[in-house]
């Protein structure tokens, strides 16, 4: 294979070096003075109720006899659900409700599951490209094994029990540590001369909304804006309309670009907190902010670096502080944390 041959790698580098030059940050440090970066870790343990829910949902999605999780592309769907489980109970509950909707549709259509796969706007944005590659094929997939009425009834009852358990968990274990972590971060950046601003990254839109409500009720009401792939909330639309009215000379004619400008301006001039999904990990210049919270850790370390690059960049005047939430009982989180130490 050309891509994995060492000889071809060397040949390709020789062919490209006359037109392609890679400059690392360390290569220009003599000319451009980048600020320092300080990392903080917030370790947390899920509550017993969260642990029980995680075990039961894990067993459910791994059971190949279950109807709601499609047989085709099961591995990818299970992967995404696992990531949502590590994000928040709110994300888990919403996903379980989507699975229940799927069972009800299967029941209504008499067992034909051909065009029914769990497509949900809350699927992790980092997997959207992978999903689009087989979207059409999934929608045209045909399941030959029709579930019985008894199977559907039993699975719906079990799924409802999981939804009920999720609904009883009002605040997650790691959420209880969020306000304290933000305030410690604010104190750190105050000492470094930074502004009282923080961007919080999550991988789930439902977690974004859950955190917005939680922080609004715990001292940050009217101090928060959100940024995701849609930016169609009433708050985003209000900010956009205000920006259009007061900054007409800066408009580009593209609603998506102007919305991005409006949200960045609102964060810079008014808000203390921006809660964002991976949609904000590229293309935003937030050098006026020097505090970042990784509420969810992507499994790809490069994505973490892309997030940090929103604030730790050229024209950043202060040292930056990065707060990483680590689930000490999640082996993937622990391993990723170990990787980030090097």
Would you name each region that the model predicts?
Residues 302-308, 313-342:
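A conserved SF2-helicase RecA2
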Residues 1-115, 332-342:
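Inter-lobe coupling linker of SF2 helicases/translocases
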Residues 34-46, 93-270:
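Conserved Helicase C-terminal RecA-like lobe
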Residues 218-222, 299, 314-318:
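Secondary-structure transition/capping motifs at alpha-helix termini
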Residues 47-51, 84-85, 91-92, 99, ...:
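Conserved nucleotide-binding/hydrolysis micro-motifs of P-loop NTPases
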Residues 285-296, 321-324:
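A short beta-strand element within the Helicase C-terminal
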Residues 264, 275-289, 309-313:
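SF2 helicase motor core recognition
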